[in-house]
Amino acid sequence: MKVLVAGSTGALGVPLVRALAAGGHEVAGLTRNPANRARLRALGARPLVADVLDRPGLLRAVDGLTVDAVVHLATAFRDMPMRHHGMAATNELRTRGTANMLAAARAVGAGRFLAESMIFGYGYGDWGDRVLTEEDPPFGPPGRNAGLEAHVAAMRESTRRTLTAEGIAGISLRYGGFYGPGPASEAIVELLRRRRLPVLHGAGVISLVFIQDAVAATVAALERGRAGQAYNVVDDEPVAWRTFLRALAEAVGAPPPRELPAWLLRPANYAHAAFTTSMRVSNAKARRELGWAPSVPTWREGVPLIAAALRNAA
């Protein structure tokens, strides 16, 4: 299969490009930064330089290229966003960027288009013990909070464009929180080491996914995903943020996180929303239709792998 990957040097893009190339696929990696060319070649990809938000430049970059599938993973995450404005660039990549990538997909003759989304698209807040599936209405009730609505609206728009695209099999992947060796956990580990990431009293449950399992699910969706479908890509056991962060801090030798009442994090309004959301998400559809299952089923197996990778890199 010939695959074009946007966001090819990101936390998910790098291991995905590596896995696709190792699996015998021809990969073109889209990057905004010319300095990433050598890195993409080392991963086994043909580098293409363009800004996803610049449609004319993007179409020039892919001119003459022919692929079977396009994977749109482009985000603007560099560090963990703390305030709503830290999500603005990613929101634009999910709206205008998705529209531009669909135009590029048509230009290169792609038959499949996969777009990144997040389980937070179900809506920030406390879902209690309810287990969310793809049958649940995504994107929550609009208007509850202007900042949160901007993020949810961007995911809503990306998914709508992806799943209703004419002449192309569009698939939306709703990833859980990424963690694992390398960039997937570097920001959190650094914040824990500096005691800059507290645990909040009584707050927050999240469905995570180990980064290599996110890669495997993406490859499975490329090969077996159904057109017009969304898939939750999460592990088998939701975990309280406080439990996960304490375990990760201990495993990597960081000091125990400070404990704070949740209201003290409100000035960091995006982080407050993310860490106080309680969300349990099912991966049954991805298991059933993609033939995928997480190799790291829970955080209990995943946290030691992060610690081991850090020791090996030291």
Predicted feature locations:
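N-terminal Rossmann NAD(P)H-binding glycine-rich loop of SDR-like oxidoreductase domains
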Residues: 3-25
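Mid/C-terminal beta-alpha module of Rossmann-like enzyme folds, strongest
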Residues: 18, 217-271, 311-314
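NAD(P)H-binding glycine-rich loop region in Rossmannoid oxidoreductase-like domains
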Residues: 32-41, 45-96, 100
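Conserved Rossmann-fold NAD(P)-dependent oxidoreductase catalytic core, especially the SDR/UDP-sugar
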Residues: 82-87, 91, 96-148
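Glycine/proline-rich active-site loop of Rossmann-fold NAD(P)-dependent oxidoreductases
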Residues: 126-127, 156, 165-168, 179-189, ...
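Active-site Tyr-X1-5-Lys
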Residues: 140-170
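Amphipathic terminal alpha-helices
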Residues: 297-314
